[in-house]
Design a protein with these regions (language model features):
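Structured catalytic-domain cores with a bias toward divalent-metal coordination
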Residues: 1-340
């Protein structure tokens, strides 16, 4: 069967070709146009339409580099289906190196958006109408917030079978069961019946090269599982373990924080994970973990007030934690921090 052209924003992309599509989004104060830039790879055979997007939060840079590297490796002549890559969704936040839009709204709480709403609502509406509704599958790339690092992980509603299959194919050490939040892209995709997985890795405004390499390989693994690319999944693979809950360990005392555990480490209930100390004295206070699990998120600021979040711990059922711990070890061996 002859493969048809793909149409996006009134532009037709022929089978076996790559095309840059710029969708007018808004204008800056000085009348400079702002576009949503999508790179489209339209394969020679019919198949799924995969949307890969990054920087819905404008300061989350790892996903942008994942997209850039992915674009350098994709060949539409070897592709079944269509890949739509949007490296920067929140163009306003990216320019300002900010998570948010100029009006301090979170774009990932504005979906599905409105043509006549506030800026965030309008941008969400444009992204939805132009790109989301053209996709059959979505991979949304994120990082931790400023001064917080995340262990590479997939967040997904594990009750969605198609999305769970994508999550397992991606190949992170941990899959975290996570329900959708109102106004998020995940919530919109769920309403539209589009399976979506969210990749969390690294810290805002920083490149984490292990996370970037794992992201590129993970997207390609998903494409292979969807029969968009030929070949087997990367040998650098783990069988992810699902954590159905996670919780933050919070500081109980004001002062300087001296961590005793690191990202990806398995910890036991009652284990000392940090100590706080008064900067004017020698009083040490131990912070003990109320959970048994794996550290999947960590605060990088060694100063904290009472109640501030320090460590995010994924919790597992039964013997799964041993499997998850092995996955972390395999992952660390497979991906290094070298830029290339």
């Amino acid at each position: 069967m002859k493969h048809k052209s793909f149409q996006l924003a009134n532009q037709r992309i022929a089978p076996g070709s790559r095309h840059s599509v710029k969708i007018p989004a808004a204008r800056l104060y000085n009348d400079t146009p702002m576009d949503l830039h999508a790179e489209v790879f339209h394969g020679v055979k019919p198949g799924p339409r995969l949307l890969v997007c990054a920087a819905i939060h404008g300061d989350e840079l790892n996903g942008i580099e994942v997209c850039r590297r992915l674009m350098g490796e994709l060949d539409p002549l070897q592709l079944a289906g269509t890949v739509i890559i949007v490296p920067i969704v929140n163009v306003f936040g990216f320019i300002q190196q900010s998570r948010y839009l100029p009006d301090r709204r979170d774009l990932n709480r504005c979906f599905p958006g409105s043509e006549r709403g506030a800026l965030g609502s309008r941008l969400a509406h444009l992204f939805n109408e132009s790109l989301v509704q053209n996709a059959t599958h979505i991979i949304d790339l994120h990082t931790g917030a400023i001064h917080r690092s995340n262990l590479p992980q997939i967040r997904v509603d594990t009750d969605n079978g198609d999305a769970l299959e994508m999550a397992e194919a991606f190949g992170t050490p941990v899959i975290l069961h996570s329900k959708e939040r109102d106004g998020s892209l995940r919530s919109l995709a769920s309403e539209l019946g589009i399976p979506l997985i969210l990749y969390e890795a690294g810290e805002a405004l920083r490149f984490d090269y292990a996370a970037i390499k794992a992201g590129v390989t993970g997207v390609q693994n998903v494409m292979k599982s969807l029969k968009m690319l030929k070949g087997r999944r990367s040998r650098k693979k783990v069988k992810p373990v699902v954590a159905h809950r996670s919780a933050w360990i919070r500081n109980e005392y004001d002062g300087l924080v001296v961590p005793k555990v690191e990202l990806g480490q398995t910890i036991n209930k009652g284990q000392v994970v940090a100590q706080t100390v008064n900067p004017h004295g020698d009083d040490l206070h131990a912070i003990k973990s109320p959970y048994h699990g794996i550290v999947i998120g960590i605060s990088n600021i060694p100063v904290a007030n009472e109640g501030e979040a320090l460590f995010n711990v994924a919790q597992f059922d039964g013997e799964r934690i041993e499997h998850a711990s092995e996955n972390v070890d395999v992952f660390v061996e497979a991906y290094d921090q070298k830029p290339i």
